[in-house]
Swiss-Prot record:
Belongs to the TrpA family. Its EC number is 4.2.1.20. This is Tryptophan synthase alpha chain. Pfam families: Trp_syntA. The active site is at 49 (proton acceptor), 60 (proton acceptor). It catalyses: (1S,2R)-1-C-(indol-3-yl)glycerol 3-phosphate + L-serine = D-glyceraldehyde 3-phosphate + L-tryptophan + H2O. Pathway: Amino-acid biosynthesis; L-tryptophan biosynthesis; L-tryptophan from chorismate: step 5/5. The lineage of its organism: Bacteria, Pseudomonadati, Pseudomonadota, Gammaproteobacteria, Chromatiales. It comes from Nitrosococcus oceani (strain ATCC 19707 / BCRC 17464 / JCM 30415 / NCIMB 11848 / C-107). The alpha subunit is responsible for the aldol cleavage of indoleglycerol phosphate to indole and glyceraldehyde 3-phosphate. SUPFAM superfamilies: Ribulose-phoshate binding barrel. GO terms for cellular component: cytosol. Tetramer of two alpha and two beta chains. It is an enzyme of class 4 (lyase). PANTHER family: TRYPTOPHAN SYNTHASE ALPHA CHAIN, CHLOROPLASTIC, TRYPTOPHAN SYNTHASE, ALPHA CHAIN.
Amino acid sequence: MSRITERFTVLRGQGRKALVPYITAGDPQPQVTVPLMHAMVAAGADILELGVPFSDPMADGPVIQKACERALAAGTSLLDVLAMVAEFRRKDQETPVILMGYLNPIEILGYRSFAEQAAAHGVDGLLTVDMPPEEAEPLAAVCKEQGLDRIFLLAPTSSPKRIEQISALGSGFIYYVSLKGVTGASTLDVDDVSQRVAKIRHYTTMPVGVGFGIRDARSAAQIASIADAAVVGSALVKRIEQYQNRPEVIPEEVSALLRTMREAIDATENV
């Protein structure tokens, strides 16, 4: 059982939902990332999602695009991100870590080399936003060999066939993108998300995480009442951007926002 599956199993047994924060690794400086990861776990994060900075993050909105620019300007590479995970693992062997990003850096390293190094450094799962499931089998196969969960996105427009396809090919959990468009996009329609998550559950037993559009404690709690996990990214990355010139305060500032989300989710669960 992977760390991701184990975490969802434990949470389900406790009647709790996962809080999954996203940050771009190396933003605003590489030395901030690992302390921030530990701070987010202390603030109530159940699974961590690390963005691998890329020069053309087409699925991301302006907030995460700027984060990628800052991380790349600071010299952050895919190998640096793997080293950050290894450093995190020296103190935390329990919290699952997912890498989220684009295919190009992985292709440059090579599928097998990437999967072997990712597993050796303590990565638990991979989500590549620009690789459709029709093309994913070679990378998914080497990830499976190394015990890495292969996580896929579902959109509001995804068909039942696509849901079944991703359920068969993926593992860990399904990531439902609650809004059309890029990360950081507009208003969250909770009723629509509820209906679509119910539809996804009809075709799979995998946990369902929902991301895009979670901005604050209220929206995090709303999503957690529907799905197995609330994934929050742009709101945290905005906080990092706000304090980019005071990197020493970033772990506490981001954690403060994350704690409000954790408290709201837990309060909803206890109603």
